[in-house]
Amino acid sequence: MKGFIDDANYSVGLLDEGTNLGNVIDNYVYEHTLTGKNAFFVGDLGKIVKKHSQWQNVVAQIKPFYTVKCNSAPAVLEILAALGTGFACSSKNEMALVQELGVPPENIIYISPCKQVSQIKYAAKVGVNILTCDNEIELKKIARNHPNAKVLLHIATEDNIGGEEGNMKFGTTLKNCRHLLECAKELDVQIIGVKFHVSSACKESQVYVHALSDARCVFDMAGEIGFTMNMLDIGGGFTGTEFQLEEVNHVISPLLDIYFPEGSGVKIISEPGSYYVSSAFTLAVNIIAKKVVENDKFPSGVEKTGSDEPAFMYYMNDGVYGSFASKLSEDLNTIPEVHKKYKEDEPLFTSSLWGPSCDELDQIVESCLLPELNVGDWLIFDNMGADSFHEPSAFNDFQRPAIYYMMSFSDWYEMQDAGITSDSMMKNFFFVPSCIQLSQEDSFSAEA
């Protein structure tokens, strides 16, 4: 089966009982070793279905609007559309992608904090009326270019103000909300609700307590000014673990009952992104170069072996100018799995992992302990479904990794039993036999 670099015409392999994702990865490693050793993804769409079931079981009162920029692969968007999620879009292209799947405009919100006028006009043209806004200038742009806009006022949380760099730029203060509401009234812009965002890195449950209290204050302010608000967006920040989802629900559920009880007419939504897709994708990369260095060249405080032992720098065929782009703005906590078999008592060496660009920024893992690897060996990175699918840089002729989609028969049956269908997606399934033999050159050669 070919992997789809432009996966608009993707196919999905249905795994027979006895075939697991590890078998599939083994086989593609074998194929890619023979044909060019390019990096590749394997996506398990069944995990997305499971995440949605988990969401419905834990926080059924909150409608998810999937954050498209997190992973806009057509297969991902199509399965989420079939599951009935909404979509949070940051650009014209993202809005167009989900509308091509037949998603109605009322299930799309335009969440970019800094909107281009042409894209506001596009949203107005296609009927995407729900937008977010956190300042007067954006409010005036919306008033001039989107006559049917319904705005969610984006408020800052203590988490944002406290200094997470990626978030502190966005969200207005509670103190400024009355001014913005009065401006909206003068501009005849309809304010329909409030949005806030708590990052996944935040460990303080009190941030949700304060954010929901602030949101209630803004609802009350809006009522005094003459707005009737009916939507609360609690943002993203969901990591994907059931434990974290239950923890958040434990905090917010009683507060929602107090501030926005059932029957109040307020619809509660959220913007999960990595929650749905992170664990669904695995990335396989190849070692293309290797250097032996002195152990003391590694910074103090990182995991190291004895100073008299060698250390290794490994260069991979994917990096921050490709699938690891998010490493430029956040830490990567994933330590890869070595694909080749090695003995349990094989010595481990201090190692660092780098992308292929030779740029000092292209360091993927600063330090980890690995057995000695050779050029041509493979490393497997789990949880690579979020923020990994950007267009690669043209530098050094980087190639976008192929994507191979899979789903177990049990997950497929679960979809059918739940009444989840998509005509176009159903055409893309093909059967994967359980007898994958890595010794055969043509193994797993079924075409979509």
UniProtKB/Swiss-Prot annotation:
UniProt-listed GO biological process terms: negative regulation of protein catabolic process; positive regulation of polyamine transmembrane transport; putrescine biosynthetic process from arginine, via ornithine
Pfam families in UniProt: Orn_Arg_deC_N, Orn_DAP_Arg_deC
This protein's record includes keyword NAD: no
PROSITE patterns tied to this protein: ODR_DC_2_2
Record localization: Nucleus
InterPro entries reported for this sequence: Ala_racemase/Decarboxylase_C, Azin1, De-COase2_C, De-COase2_CS, De-COase2_N, Orn/DAP/Arg_de-COase, Orn_de-COase, PLP-binding_barrel
A GO molecular function held by the record: ornithine decarboxylase activator activity
Site (Not modified): K69
Post-translational modification: Ubiquitinated, leading to its proteasomal degradation; a process that is reduced in presence of antizyme OAZ1.
Gene3D superfamilies xrefs: Alanine racemase, Lyase, Ornithine Decarboxylase, Chain A, domain 1
Any single GO CC term annotated in Swiss-Prot or TrEMBL for this entry: cytosol
Alphabetic keyword roster: Nucleus, Polyamine biosynthesis, Ubl conjugation
Tissue expression profile of the protein: Expressed in liver.
SUPFAM superfamilies: Alanine racemase C-terminal domain-like (SSF50621), PLP-binding barrel (SSF51419)
Keyword Ubl conjugation: yes
Function: Antizyme inhibitor (AZI) protein that positively regulates ornithine decarboxylase (ODC) activity and polyamine uptake. AZI is an enzymatically inactive ODC homolog that counteracts the negative effect of ODC antizymes (AZs) OAZ1, OAZ2 and OAZ3 on ODC activity by competing with ODC for antizyme-binding. Inhibits antizyme-dependent ODC degradation and releases ODC monomers from their inactive complex with antizymes, leading to formation of the catalytically active ODC homodimer and restoring polyamine production.
Family: Belongs to the Orn/Lys/Arg decarboxylase class-II family. ODC antizyme inhibitor subfamily.
Subunit structure and binding partners: Monomer. Interacts with OAZ1 and OAZ3; this interaction disrupts the interaction between the antizyme and ODC1.
Protein name (record): Antizyme inhibitor 1
Organism listed in the record: Homo sapiens
Gene: AZIN1
